[in-house]
Amino acid sequence: MTPGIHLGNITCRNELRPGDLGYIAYLHGQIYAKECGYGLGFEAYVLEGLQEFAHQYDPDRDRVWICEHDNNIVGFLLGFHRSDSMHRSDSMHRSDSGHQTDTLQLRYFILLPDYRGIGLGKKLMLEFLAFMKLSNYTRAYLWTTNEQHAAVSLYTRYGFRLTEEKISDAFDKQLTERKYELELPTNSK
């Protein structure tokens, strides 16, 4: 965290603009190479997923949170609608079949290092959960790795539970991919 950076100085928008998705891929490539040693395989994975999202983006069912400070993107989170059949047999590299769903995938959550520890991650998680409720999603899931300790701490604090693990070398090094799921209580009528 850098002195002078405060949550109140950061704005979040929900509309995509040209260049946003490309920049998010760039941030993932740069930050994860530096912090985790991920290679071009990881960047290719991110690019493929963002391309899939761009082609299937539905503003009524999907949501992006693009956090900016002084007109620069400093954080990002994406909620992507998924079919139940895809969700049940998902791996990090599967594509959506396009059916109606009540499942939302949390993807590409990233904060620049100077913007961690100021409450921005918490704010984005609360907004993600609010969008789930507003849009009548009852389930969410995400994939991460065994190296993302701070992220996992945040996810589990908001109710995500580990449901699957597998060894992978998809990011140019061996690690454990982990799936976390969240189920919201349904309102009985």
Q: Language-model segments: which ranges?
A:
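C-terminal "cap" of GNAT-fold acetyltransferases
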Residues: 3-10, 20, 138-152, 156-189
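Amphipathic alpha-helical dimerization/coiled-coil segments
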Residues: 1-3, 56
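Residues that form or flank phosphate/diphosphate-binding pockets in enzymes
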Residues: 101, 119, 150
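Short phosphate-binding/catalytic loops that engage adenosine nucleotides
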Residues: 111, 120, 137, 160
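Active-site acidic-Proline motif in GNAT/NAT acetyltransferases
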Residues: 112-114, 118, 146-147
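Short coil/turn segments at alpha/beta junctions that flank glycine-rich nucleotide-binding fingerprints
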Residues: 35, 118, 134-138
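Residue-level preference for beta-strand/loop junctions
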Residues: 59, 102-103, 136, 174-176
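Acetyl-CoA-dependent GNAT
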Residues: 14-88, 93-114, 122-127, 131, ...
